[in-house]
Amino acid sequence: MPTDNDLKTSIVELLRDLDALLVAHFYQKDEIVELAHYTGDSLELAKIASQSDKNLIVFCGVHFMGESVKALAFNKQVIMPKLSCCSMARMIDSHYYDRSVHLLKEYGVKEFYPITYINSNAEVKAKVAKDDGVVCTSRNASKIFNHALKQNKKIFFLPDKCLGENLALENGLKSAILGINSPEEIKNADVVCYNGFCSVHQLFKLEDIEFYRQKYPDILIAVHPECEPSVVSNADFSGSTSQIIEFVEKLSPHQKVAIGTESHLVNRLKAKRNHQNTFILSSTLAFCPTMNETTLKDLFEVLKAYKNHRAYNAIELKDEVARLAKLALTKMMELS
């Protein structure tokens, strides 16, 4: 059995031989992040990979991320060591999007402006594009939301109800959740949210904030906007993974901070600063199971197979789906 160091050496050699670009999301395992040419959040990696001069992109993340790169750069080869699917992205597909639109119309919502969080598959992004909507990420969500408000239509935000509710609260707007609230509440809401969520960020609770504030009165709380509204509204800072990193790295090493996002990222931040002053905002192990499926062995095997002309786990999209998804993604990039 090859050791981890053997695998790392082989992976570096294969990447060089294949002239490939390796990108990894912040939530990937440390040994994967260590080898990546670039690490980042969804928006950063989509831009970097699609604009790279490399023809072969190796994406360590979850499936919708690979799809986004393929849609933006259709002629590139995009492969993934694991075709892991984000649990939130699994909560909606094109069929459920159509059903949601049907419900909105049944409830008397004649016009709406759809925003899909990037955590959705390419077919959903294509549906949103056909309805003249746009994609957003947690980093640019406020800018995209402000653009949507100028359309003077009810906003349909999918699939993450928490991010949608948090954006509504940020703008003093009334929100309702499709499938939870009554037809009358849906009709009267400014923002209608699909009933999806992140299984990791649901672990962070208001009680966790209260615990840390009681124990350390001067502590700062930084969370991801996929957390529940009660958590976000009581935090000192809310932002994307990149924004959380930027926020924490600017703090004095003496400043205590509790962070509400995936544990691998928090542990890396702890290693960079005074670990005794850096905490994860949960007593539960908050790691993303699908983000952590990718191993060094998976990465080595997918590269070796590609070199031997036995490629697998290649991202494929229908031409029309890719074209429409690209429209929604490009619109997002132009607005942000």
Curated annotation (Swiss-Prot):
Pathway in which the depicted protein is active: Cofactor biosynthesis; NAD(+) biosynthesis; quinolinate from iminoaspartate: step 1/1
Name of the protein described by the UniProt record: Quinolinate synthase
Binding annotation for iminosuccinate: 25, 42, 117-119, 138, 224-226, 241
Signal peptide segment: none
PANTHER family: QUINOLINATE SYNTHASE, CHLOROPLASTIC, QUINOLINATE SYNTHETASE A
Major localization listed first in the record, in broad terms: cytoplasm
The keyword 4Fe-4S belongs to this UniProt entry's keyword annotation: yes
Binding-site residues, [4Fe-4S] cluster: 86, 198, 288
Protein location: Cytoplasm
Keywords associated with the record: 4Fe-4S, Cytoplasm, Iron, Iron-sulfur, Metal-binding, Pyridine nucleotide biosynthesis, Transferase
Similarity comment: family membership: Belongs to the quinolinate synthase family. Type 3 subfamily.
Tagged with keyword Iron-sulfur: yes
Cofactor note: Binds 1 [4Fe-4S] cluster per subunit.
InterPro entries assigned to the protein according to its UniProt record, in alphabetical order: NadA, NadA_sf, Quinolinate_synth_A_type3
The encoding gene: nadA
Cofactor: [4Fe-4S] cluster
The protein's Enzyme Commission number: 2.5.1.72
HAMAP family, sorted: NadA_type3
GO cellular component: cytosol
Native source organism of the sequence: Helicobacter pylori (strain J99 / ATCC 700824)
GO biological process, alphabetically ordered: 'de novo' NAD biosynthetic process from L-aspartate
A Pfam family of this chain: NadA
Function: Catalyzes the condensation of iminoaspartate with dihydroxyacetone phosphate to form quinolinate.
GO MF term set: 4 iron, 4 sulfur cluster binding; metal ion binding; quinolinate synthetase A activity
